[in-house]
Amino acid sequence: MGRDFSLKNTRNIGIMAHIDAGKTTTTERILYYTGRIHKIGETHEGASQMDWMEQEQDRGITITSAATTAEWKNHRVNIIDTPGHVDFTVEVERSLRVLDGAVTVLDAQSGVEPQTETVWRQATTYGVPRIVFVNKMDKIGANFDYAVSTLHDRLQANAAPIQLPIGAEDEFSAIIDLVTMKCFKYNNDLGTEIEEVEIPEDYRERAEEAREALIEAVAETNESLMEKIFDEQEITVDELKDAIRQATTDVEFYPVLCGTAFKNKGVQLMLDAVIDYLPSPLDVKPIVGHRADNPDEEVIAKADDDAEFAALAFKVMTDPYVGKLTFFRVYSGTLTSGSYVKNSTKGKRERVGRILQMHANSREEISSVYSGDIAAAVGLKDTGTGDTLCGEKNDIILESMEFPEPVIHLSVEPKSKADQDKMTQALVKLQEEDPTFKAHTDEETGQVIIGGMGELHLDIIVDRMKKEFNVEANVGAPMVSYRETFKTSAAVQGKFSRQSGGRGQYGDVHIEFTPNETGAGFEFENAIVGGVVPREYIPSVEQGLKDAMENGVLAGYPLIDVKAKLFDGSYHDVDSSEMAFKIAASLALKEAAKKCDPVILEPMMKVTIEMPEEYMGDIMGDVTARRGRVDGMEPRGNAQVVNAYVPLSEMFGYATSLRSNTQGRGTYTMYFDHYAEVPKSISEEIIKKNKGE
């Protein structure tokens, strides 16, 4: 059986936004109009079709990116719903990696919000073309022009409306399409009856001005359009559409649309814009990977059904009915169920038992997938997030995703022996699904420690253990993941020599330690000349340093951002061994700790707080009391926004404190930004606590 939709008629899109901008409702309406859902489910009633994990329905927020397939005007649209909460940035990152385009949903009253900025930045990093949907036009305080201005002011985006709303709040009744200069009026509550009418006289002038502005914004990226403007020639609808599509695909322009998903207005026109302006897999640059056996040799995965099969696994989930589901995006070639593939990242052969086309929480079994498709495979045992799957003859590894290390930890203790075994299984599965979630057993205390990107992240993990895996656990207080580093340089010697009858142990190294740039990690340089340390022992020196750095030099936290240059040493023909050089390296690090001025680093969070003006003084005082540094303030509508950097250790329980300081009218978001040195007094406390004093 051949493909149902050509590559040209395929769209892989994500829907991204700040929490509560109406993203899930928007996706829901898309599924309703494309005939995938017969009853509309409201997020605030906890019944949305995309939010299919229990936690998501309880909290009314989207956590996992469910992939859904829909059809519109003879096109296949694969939609990935991405979470808007900062603790789940990993979900956003991994979905952006496999998309060709995205719809950014804004709240018509708030415009660009803090999390919109974060997601927008991530999308820019991955070069994802976007259209913008200004949602909630029916809301009190909705202001389309203000929302568009925030795209310019806060994101410096070359964005211009391709639609204008007629009315706002309760009066929002129709939408003017500036490309075709037609007006669409909604006559019923479900938004299925749309009438094309003339643009009202009192809007005509404004619409013409907005169309001029649109043409100028697009012409900046298009020479032939610019020439037509200079020659004062008429620009046809098709020419304008083509120019908008080209500029959008090149990520040089962002068309802005309007509507209200909740009141069913503007969603079909937004679907039309997805088809008209967002790229098909053929329009985006082919993805470049490298050969598995030679990282320097580039290989291109071309969007072509006849090419060798290559796909990227971007999400792993445990499904109660079919077990492990691996979501993947096909970049080239085709795959049939029952066939074998190679996981080139891990060098393993895997069998694809079944292929499922996902629709939020129902599924349809299909026999084949083609280039450009997004589907889920059942039966892959060893494949994890970011792994490349390819044909058995192919040898490509696609660029994987990088995930941040956890910044917050807490201990979990099973309540009974039965819970113990279930918890071990649950933690293995949850780590498979979420690369930013880590679990390990503390060697000294025997406690299980879990780590993640924020309090909400770990709350939801514990919640899932209880609901999905029936694990009852006691949870400890959150702990901050501190780090250590050196502030000054020193050259030191590490010598290990042991003679106790028979064969001895001997290793001797001279290493120069210097501070590395923030975030650059550990760098090891071998500067040995003349074989004073034989080549076979060099990796042991590096490994010995890495192992010792894991346990730190001050308070047991990992040592980061340090350069180590091995420049001298000596060895013994008989007594030297890999182990002896490992120990010598760790002794050198101990010696360096005395001379290199080690310090403790703490995670600093970028915090954005929004509240009514009258609470400004209290909030600023509170930020300062938490050792925070205010980075700027700006008015947003009738509220004030404070941007600050605050240590994570001072942010526990902040939600409660903010609620009481603002009578429940303040909101905040925070995400990890960088590591910074801890003040001396606090550093001493941390060291004492860790030494059990």
Curated annotation (Swiss-Prot):
SMART domains found in the cross-reference section: EFG_C, EFG_IV
GO MF term list: GTP binding; GTPase activity; translation elongation factor activity
The keyword Manganese appears for this protein: no
Stretches assigned to the tr-type G domain: 8-282
Subcellular compartments: Cytoplasm
Record keywords: Cytoplasm, Elongation factor, GTP-binding, Nucleotide-binding, Protein biosynthesis
Residues where GTP binds: 17-24, 81-85, 135-138
GO biological process, one term: ribosome disassembly
Pfam families: EFG_C (PF00679), EFG_III (PF14492), EFG_IV (PF03764), GTP_EFTU (PF00009), GTP_EFTU_D2 (PF03144)
One CC-aspect GO term: cytoplasm
Entry keyword Cytoplasm: yes
Its job: Catalyzes the GTP-dependent ribosomal translocation step during translation elongation. During this step, the ribosome changes from the pre-translocational (PRE) to the post-translocational (POST) state as the newly formed A-site-bound peptidyl-tRNA and P-site-bound deacylated tRNA move to the P and E sites, respectively. Catalyzes the coordinated movement of the two tRNA molecules, the mRNA and conformational changes in the ribosome.
HAMAP family attached to this UniProt entry: EF_G_EF_2_B
Protein family according to the UniProt entry: Belongs to the TRAFAC class translation factor GTPase superfamily. Classic translation factor GTPase family. EF-G/EF-2 subfamily.
The protein's name in its UniProt record: Elongation factor G
Lineage: Bacteria, Bacillati, Bacillota, Bacilli, Bacillales
